[in-house]
């Protein structure tokens, strides 16, 4: 069901560069550890980039969009046509991630991997096996061929970013109903009750959240999904095209030794899928923020992740990762630019 490349081992981060970065941090004109997570992320980037001077300047953002048949069950506060309308907004520069990417100097690529849009759209790459998933409350969301195709779409999207020579990459998503698909995937893979995963998504009230959880619970039962179900079968049963594309893109980026700055709940579920398919990609993941979406904390815990910021964001679109990017840039600037005790003729800590 999934292509063979997705199992290929990802390179390991450079232990030598990690040790060198740690040694440099110990020599900078500050108490060791005084810059907290800024020190940690700089050291991690140095190891991932195998660089004496880590960087976070060249950062392409790739946004994957897809529609969801499950939206017919009233699991979103917005109608399905919003997905395609938002594609025009992304391409026109009016969406949050478009503004953030422009402000940060990040190239933005929008990829339609499965919206209901018919034909080409200006400013959007179209690479999809079908127009939307099927309603997984009544049938399989996708065929095995769909799952394979869209994972390859993630690989192709990563290949298109090579000309940017990325320091790291950011992936994002758009798709009405995709928090339902993400919650269903997470509930299956983690053996969690849907009620413990489901959040407000685009703004559901308590009644809407309960309905959403029941839809997922019934679907997991219908498809016989458990923690023992192979990942590819879970994806075919309840997956989303953009979620699978991001999982493929995460593995493909890690195989190229590109760090991935992971966004919120839905991208974290894609990261969970990626690590289940290829555990060697896990060291290449940096986690940007803790979303206000209820299930995000559960998924972060399963991944052993420590996000950088917590601003109650729940938009998606890679907006949280983009918001955290300046922190990575400042961490690199401090690591690379601060003087050592010797350079500044400042006395170091006494033994």
Swiss-Prot record:
Alphabetical list of Pfam families matching this protein: DBI_PRT (PF02277)
Keywords, sorted A to Z: Cobalamin biosynthesis, Glycosyltransferase, Transferase
Gene3D superfamilies xrefs: 1.10.1610.10, 3.40.50.10210
The keyword Cell wall biogenesis/degradation is annotated on this UniProt entry: no
Source organism, top-level taxon: Bacteria
Catalytic activity: 5,6-dimethylbenzimidazole + nicotinate beta-D-ribonucleotide = alpha-ribazole 5'-phosphate + nicotinate + H(+)
Pathway: Nucleoside biosynthesis; alpha-ribazole biosynthesis; alpha-ribazole from 5,6-dimethylbenzimidazole: step 1/2
Top-tier EC class: transferase
Single annotated GO MF: nicotinate-nucleotide-dimethylbenzimidazole phosphoribosyltransferase activity
EC number: 2.4.2.21
Function, in words: Catalyzes the synthesis of alpha-ribazole-5'-phosphate from nicotinate mononucleotide (NAMN) and 5,6-dimethylbenzimidazole (DMB).
Homology family: Belongs to the CobT family.
Stated name of the protein: Nicotinate-nucleotide--dimethylbenzimidazole phosphoribosyltransferase
